[in-house]
A protein has these predicted regions:
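Large intracellular
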Residues: 1-49, 121-176
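Helix-termination/interfacial motifs at the ends of transmembrane alpha-helices
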Residues: 38-118
Length: 176
């Protein structure tokens, strides 16, 4: 399972949970609570860069307004200049406003939203791991536990029951 092997948090998450299970902490609710706390902490920490980008996106229009105000001040300082000079100052003020709004809503905001979507998708992946392990702790058979995990897969990626069954049947007996 290459995705799990490349994901250090997923490996630690699975190993820590299995370690708790081997230490006779077999109450599924306690294990689920511990896993939930670990997932919340990880999700909160992983989302910090997206929150920082969104904060920057929220502030950029204000910088555009500051540029507009400075442009107006500069224009007022040269009020006796010919219209062509005043037009340049006013144009500069408008460009500053436009850039602040354009960069915020055209680049930084969408990038922050994309980052958050990636973190949310990762969180779904970890949540599926949690669902499968907790279902197993409740005494369900492996196929039932995996089916419970399948229910948490986002719809656009969720395999059908038949696809999952085919994948499970393809696992060699010595592994399963």
């Amino acid at each position: 399972y290459p995705r799990i092997l490349k994901d250090h948090f997923a490996i630690d998450f699975i190993c820590d949970t299995l370690r708790m299970m081997t230490m006779n902490l077999e109450d599924p609710h306690q294990v689920e609570d511990a896993m939930e706390k670990q997932l919340e902490k990880h999700h909160h920490e992983a989302a910090d860069p997206a929150h920082a980008m969104q904060t920057m996106a929220d502030g950029l229009p204000a910088l555009g307004i500051v540029a507009a105000v400075l442009g107006v001040i500069k224009t007022m300082g040269a009020i006796e200049s010919p219209p062509s000079v005043l037009g340049g100052y006013i144009g500069g003020a408008l460009v500053g406003t436009f850039l602040g709004v354009f960069i915020a809503y055209g680049f930084v905001g969408p990038f922050a939203a994309y980052m958050q979507a990636v973190y949310d998708e990762e969180h779904s992946f970890y949540k599926i791991i949690q669902d499968v392990l907790v279902a197993h702790l409740h005494g369900n058979a492996a196929q039932i536990s995996v089916e419970i995990g399948r229910g948490g897969v986002p719809t656009k990626m969720q395999p059908s029951f038949t696809e999952l069954e085919t994948a499970l049947d393809s696992i060699p007996a010595e592994v399963g």
